[in-house]
């Protein structure tokens, strides 16, 4: 009877959340079509998923659960390889609606080559990502893919590296430009180089000249509904994850970042005010060894930094300019030994008379080895509504929730 009541109660909460989402009125008619109008709805639904996973754990269904709602949604399934597309229902935060190639067929990459970026060979990753149809892209075997030019992705694609060891390395890397519904999961991306001044195909019917690319691991440009999850990213020429030019509805989760200078840029420039539509969730990531700054570095928009583990930085962890709203909740910050680098935050190119009005708050964060967060602006929760995307858990649980960050060593027939 108690279990029945719990299920009925959870169902009622879900119906209520959906009713709120359907009937929420648009508060700003000029607001970007992909931005979240009711972040409280997002937080309520994610909070429900956390409670549900906890209840299942209590009932014995998920003895391997960690409290990380993304992982608890799929990782305990021994038959995950037979239900790969279930992953698309597990996203949270602002990028929660990214379905990738869920509604399409599977495409198996069999060839690691990239001989011709204009006429890619069937079976290559480039041939897969440029197709117009939705595709869930998987890999036949372990492989290292060295791209000659940017891998320009078409909409409704999932790159799923689970079950094999896939590296995109030592060449060009991923470009997500003017597209929607992309999932990148379970791959290693490292040692990316600047490339360009070349012709590159972006769809079956189009190719064109590309100027020089910066050498980002993952570049998100003018795109929406993007989910970057469980990847290992390091040592690229520019950024590891950069999102610019009105990109929004993005979740960056469960990634392992190492050995890099400028880790994550969110916002094109101080003068590009169209990035005010940007909403990004940064959750359950491990910012690890050899990192220097920009975890992330934000401009203009709304950024929810929640339940991440910051174990290394040399300059600062979270920075920004041009008045972004930053909502830091339940993170663990371990400051470096350097006594002049203990501060988590950095305001770029702006005096205190201006940045004191920016809404930057720290709530429930854990500060170790002298780390500290300089708050500014309003403290009230209402001012952070557009920078709220999920319910933070206690910072004491961060170590457990991020312990499997990065590309996972998944094997068929075993819990991932």
UniProtKB/Swiss-Prot annotation:
EC identifiers of the protein: 4.2.2.2
Pathway assigned in UniProt: Glycan metabolism; pectin degradation; 2-dehydro-3-deoxy-D-gluconate from pectin: step 2/5
Active site: 294
Glycosylation site list: 23, 28, 52
Keyword Metal-binding annotated: yes
Gene Ontology molecular functions: metal ion binding; pectate lyase activity
Protein name: Probable pectate lyase 8
Biological source species: Arabidopsis thaliana
């Amino acid at each position: 009877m108690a279990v029945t009541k719990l299920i009925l109660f959870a169902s009622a909460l879900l119906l209520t959340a959906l009713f709120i989402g359907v009937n929420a009125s648009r508060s700003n008619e000029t607001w970007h079509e992909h931005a979240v109008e009711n972040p409280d709805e997002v937080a309520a639904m994610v909070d429900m998923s956390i409670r549900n996973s906890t209840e299942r754990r209590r009932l014995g269904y998920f003895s391997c659960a960690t409290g990380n709602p993304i992982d608890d949604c799929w990782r305990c399934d021994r038959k995950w390889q037979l239900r790969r597309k279930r992953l698309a229902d597990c996203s949270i935060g602002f990028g929660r609606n990214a379905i990738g190639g869920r509604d399409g067929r599977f495409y198996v990459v069999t060839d690691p080559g990239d001989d011709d970026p204009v006429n890619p060979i069937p079976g290559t990753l480039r041939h897969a990502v440029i197709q117009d149809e939705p595709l869930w892209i998987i890999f036949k075997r372990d492989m290292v893919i060295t791209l000659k030019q940017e891998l320009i992705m078409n909409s409704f694609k999932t790159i799923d590296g689970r079950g094999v060891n896939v590296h995109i390395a030592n060449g060009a890397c991923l470009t997500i430009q003017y597209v929607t519904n992309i999932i990148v999961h379970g791959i290693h991306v490292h040692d990316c180089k600047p490339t360009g001044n070349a012709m590159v195909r972006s769809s079956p019917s189009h190719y064109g000249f590309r100027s020089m690319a910066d050498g980002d691991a993952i570049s998100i440009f003018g795109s929406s509904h993007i989910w970057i999850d469980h990847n290992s990213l390091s040592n690229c020429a520019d950024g590891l994850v950069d999102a610019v030019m009105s990109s929004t509805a993005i979740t960056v989760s469960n990634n392992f970042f190492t050995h890099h200078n400028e880790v994550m840029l969110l916002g094109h420039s101080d003068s590009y005010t169209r990035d005010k539509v940007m909403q990004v969730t940064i959750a359950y990531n491990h910012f690890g060894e050899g990192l220097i700054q920009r975890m992330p570095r934000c401009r203009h928009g709304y950024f929810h930094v929640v339940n991440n583990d910051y174990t290394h930085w040399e300059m600062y962890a979270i920075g920004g300019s041009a008045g972004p709203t930053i909502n830091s909740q339940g993170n663990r910050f371990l400051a470096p030994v350097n006594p002049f680098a203990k501060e988590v935050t950095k305001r770029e190119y702006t005096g205190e008379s201006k940045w004191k009005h920016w809404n930057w708050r720290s709530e429930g964060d854990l500060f170790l080895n002298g780390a500290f967060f300089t708050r500014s602006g309003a403290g009230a929760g209402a001012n952070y509504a557009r920078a709220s995307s999920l319910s933070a858990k206690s910072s004491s649980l961060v170590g457990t929730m991020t312990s499997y960050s990065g590309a996972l060593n998944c094997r068929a027939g075993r819990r991932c």
